[in-house]
From Swiss-Prot:
It is an enzyme of class 3 (hydrolase). SUPFAM superfamilies: Obg GTP-binding protein N-terminal domain, P-loop containing nucleoside triphosphate hydrolases. An essential GTPase which binds GTP, GDP and possibly (p)ppGpp with moderate affinity, with high nucleotide exchange rates and a fairly low GTP hydrolysis rate. Plays a role in control of the cell cycle, stress response, ribosome biogenesis and in those bacteria that undergo differentiation, in morphogenesis control. It comes from Escherichia coli O1:K1 / APEC. Its EC number is 3.6.5.-. Its cofactor is Mg(2+). This is GTPase Obg. Belongs to the TRAFAC class OBG-HflX-like GTPase superfamily. OBG GTPase family. The gene is obg.
Length: 390
């Protein structure tokens, strides 16, 4: 299946149903009073994370999602039916962004997690709500409010513990093939890897971690050159980055300059990503003898001002790979993920009462109080009946 990690969609919640103006009319009951019911609330639009999905390709073709409108109120104080909700299923790891405001609405990081992205409109009030001692036959009602409408950007970010960084042909895909069951394409030309891939590294029956391989970075990636900048977002949730350096590039480029390009592109893309723990890993040491490889790695590390530990491996032969993986496993165990507190979603209710409707009633009541003297008429049957009962 084609890997798609971005999609734009339109979500429209249902409008609230309108209130009804109706009066009870039955035999032997000439003045039954108002019996117009309220409308129903509009349906909501929800996002739900599904671990069985791994791409957003479906939303390249289906771009619009609309919830059902609430039904209008009816006579006999019948409340309109609530509009049906719409649920949009997305892969785990999807970030939802409101394109209108640029706000991140939420990150779908767990299977079954739900996020409200468009709230349905509130119901309108029927004329029964406006009955009072001074207004026995109200003809007022309110209409339902419109539902939310948003254009959303969906960004799929792979959930991995370890991210791979490096220039094209640094050996990232060879490394992930060596340590996991993932089989990304490997060849001796740049940009063999065109889409991100994940591999699970199992150290024993109880310990494992997930590593992500993305297309290599080149100079100018932050301005759109190459492929890697598009996929850097997949590294934002990684706990540690493995920076692979080809210790003896076949094209004759300088390993120090190559490493500086990667660091520079990280800083241009995101300071948060650049600040993540990054380990230096020298690959393809099997192409040199042991002493020469150690001397060259030391010289490169000193030129970069690197004072931390670095690793020498050969992904092709497996030399040094196991020790590196165990150190990664230890780091992950000692640095567990801090789960961000999820925003509490509003509870779903069948009937909504709120400040909006209270305000509507208060405004109508104020109008009735102000105009009551002017509206009173000696021929008004209601007025006569009211005085008679007193």
């Amino acid at each position: 299946m084609k890997f798609v990690d971005e999609a734009s969609i339109l979500v429209v919640a249902g409008d609230g149903g309108n209130g009804c103006v109706s009066f009870r009319r039955e035999k032997y009951i000439p003045k039954g009073g108002p019996d117009g019911g309220d409308g129903g609330d509009g349906g909501d639009v929800w996002m739900e994370a599904d671990e069985n999905l791994n791409t957003l390709i479906d939303y390249r073709f289906e771009k619009s999602f609309r919830a059902e409108r609430g039904q209008n109120g009816a006579s006999r104080d019948c409340t309109g039916k609530r509009g049906k909700d719409v649920t949009i299923k997305v892969p785990v790891g999807t970030r939802v962004i409101d394109q209108g405001t640029g706000e991140t609405m939420g990150d779908m990081t767990k299977h079954g997690q739900r996020l409200l992205v468009a709230k349905g409109g509130w119901h309108g009030l029927g004329n029964t709500r406006f009955k009072s001692s001074v207004n026995r036959t109200p003809r007022q009602k309110t209409n339902g409010t419109p539902g939310d409408k948003r254009e959303l950007l969906l960004e799929l970010m792979l959930l991995a513990d370890v991210g791979m960084l490096g220039m094209p042909n640094a050996g990232k895909s060879t490394f992930i093939r060596a340590v996991s069951a993932a089989k990304p394409k490997v060849a001796d030309y740049p940009f063999t890897t065109l889409v991100p891939s994940l591999g699970v590294v199992r150290m024993d029956n109880e310990k494992s971690f997930v590593v992500a391989d993305i297309p290599g970075l080149i100079e100018g990636a932050a301005e759109g050159a190459g492929l890697g900048i598009r996929f850097l977002k997949h590294l934002e949730r990684c706990r540690v980055l493995l920076h692979l350096i080809d210790i003896d590039p076949i094209d004759g480029t300088d390993p120090v300059e190559n490493a500086r390009i990667i660091i520079s592109e990280l800083e241009k893309y995101s300071q948060d990503l650049a600040a993540k723990p990054r380990w230096l890993v020298f690959n393809k040491i099997d192409l040199l003898d042991k002493v020469e490889a150690e001397e060259k790695a030391k010289a490169i590390a000193e030129a970069l001002g690197w004072e931390d530990k670095y690793y020498l491996i050969s992904a092709a032969s497996g030399l040094g790979v196991k020790d590196l993986c165990w150190d990664v496993m230890t780091f992950i165990i000692e640095n567990p993920v801090v789960q961000a507190e999820e925003a509490k979603q509003p509870e779903k209710v069948e009937f909504m009462w709120d400040d909006y409707h209270r305000q509507q009633l208060e405004e109508i009541a104020e109008e009735d109080d102000e105009d009551w003297d002017d509206d009173w008429d000696e021929d008004d049957e209601e007025g006569v009946e009211f005085i008679y009962k007193r």
